[in-house]
């Protein structure tokens, strides 16, 4: 016979209250994020301008400084996304970044989108990189198949126990699988914050540093809106990272589905311009994750 809730079952009462509070806590972490509630200026607050009552922002880069913002909390697994409209026209030498970072110095975990500025008429490149336990050097570059300065596009990082996927709109441009069983580093234990920055990097960003920033075109602007964070906030429920009921840990998200796999192959065949796995000048022997 099923138990009926009543004060005569104190253990059940405690469990019900705990479960309710936990679900409320997780629900809050999954609501649409806003800049005012969920983010703060990381540097040069004067160059971060709020719009639409904090639902959208503008980052500014000029000769004096760039700027950046960070989430107020850190998360352990989940999905983060933003809609971004990049710098139009001549943006050579600039980098607009959207990334997650554990902020743990030499052992940091980090998942990077870096949008590399261009000379007018050239395609915009996006570089992704993955740091696990302090080790990076996993760069891949893709030329975007549209002009990302004309309108907002959604950029997403999915981070689960099984894999990390970078999406441009609904198109996966990179997948990094968890191969810890083969002694390949994978970020599993360090919570990460969500960050974005706009800065000058003309020593490497555009054509390896050949194209320098043209300050006569400054100030440069990047725009953000529709912030979305669905993850396990830290501090938070201790069971959250391993909870199989979190949707990003569900069976449907343990690998790319058939449609995503086709789109991923299309990107790699038609738009990938650099892959560290095939760069024999840097890695005469491919890194272990490239052979897994």
Swiss-Prot record:
It holds the Pfam family XET_C. The keyword Manganese does not apply. InterPro entries: Beta-glucanase/XTH, ConA-like_dom_sf, GH16, GH16_AS, XET_C, XTH. Disulfide bonds join 232-240, 277-290. GO terms for cellular component: apoplast. Contains at least one intrachain disulfide bond essential for its enzymatic activity. Xyloglucan binds at residues 114, 127-129, 137-139, 203-204, 208, 282. The record marks 112 as: Important for catalytic activity. The active site is at 110 (nucleophile), 114 (proton donor). Its EC number is 2.4.1.207. GO terms for molecular function: hydrolase activity, hydrolyzing O-glycosyl compounds; polysaccharide binding; xyloglucan:xyloglucosyl transferase activity. One of its GO terms (biological process) is cell wall biogenesis. Gene3D superfamilies: 2.60.120.200. Residues 31-224 form the GH16 domain. CDD domains: GH16_XET. It is an enzyme of class 2 (transferase). It catalyses: breaks a beta-(1->4) bond in the backbone of a xyloglucan and transfers the xyloglucanyl segment on to O-4 of the non-reducing terminal glucose residue of an acceptor, which can be a xyloglucan or an oligosaccharide of xyloglucan. The keyword Amino-acid biosynthesis does not apply. Glycans are attached at residue 118. Residues 1-30 form the signal peptide. It comes from the Eukaryota. Keywords: Apoplast, Cell wall, Cell wall biogenesis/degradation, Disulfide bond, Glycoprotein, Glycosidase, Hydrolase, Secreted, Signal, Transferase. Belongs to the glycosyl hydrolase 16 family. XTH group 1 subfamily. Catalyzes xyloglucan endohydrolysis (XEH) and/or endotransglycosylation (XET). Cleaves and religates xyloglucan polymers, an essential constituent of the primary cell wall, and thereby participates in cell wall construction of growing tissues. This is Probable xyloglucan endotransglucosylase/hydrolase protein 6.
């Amino acid at each position: 016979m099923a138990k009926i809730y009543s004060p005569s079952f104190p253990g059940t009462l405690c469990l019900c209250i705990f479960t309710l509070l936990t679900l409320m806590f997780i629900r809050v972490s999954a609501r649409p994020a806003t800049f005012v509630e969920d983010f703060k200026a990381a540097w040069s607050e004067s160059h971060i301008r709020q719009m639409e009552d904090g639902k959208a922002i503008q980052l500014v880069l000029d000769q004096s400084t760039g700027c950046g913002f960070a989430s107020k909390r850190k998360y352990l697994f989940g999905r983060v996304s933003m809609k971004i409209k990049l710098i139009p026209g001549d943006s050579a030498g600039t980098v607009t970044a959207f990334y997650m970072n554990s902020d743990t110095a030499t052992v940091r975990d980090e998942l990077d989108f870096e949008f590399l500025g261009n000379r007018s008429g050239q395609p915009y490149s996006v570089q992704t990189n993955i740091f696990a336990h302090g080790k990076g050097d996993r760069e891949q570059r893709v030329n975007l198949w549209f002009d990302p300065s004309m309108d907002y596009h959604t950029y997403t990082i999915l981070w689960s126990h099984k894999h990390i996927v970078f999406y441009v709109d609904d198109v996966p441009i990179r997948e990094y699988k968890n191969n810890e069983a083969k002694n390949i580093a994978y970020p599993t234990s360090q919570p990460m914050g969500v960050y974005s920055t706009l800065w000058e990097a003309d020593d490497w960003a555009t054509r390896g540093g050949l194209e320098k920033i043209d300050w006569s075109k400054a100030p440069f602007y990047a725009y953000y809106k529709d912030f979305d964070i669905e993850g396990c906030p830290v501090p938070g429920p201790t069971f959250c990272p391993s909870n199989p009921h979190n949707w990003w840990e569900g069976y449907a998200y343990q690998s790319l589905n058939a449609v995503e796999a086709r789109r991923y192959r299309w990107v790699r065949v038609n738009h990938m311009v650099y892959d560290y796995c095939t760069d024999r000048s840097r890695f005469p022997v491919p890194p272990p994750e490239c052979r897994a």
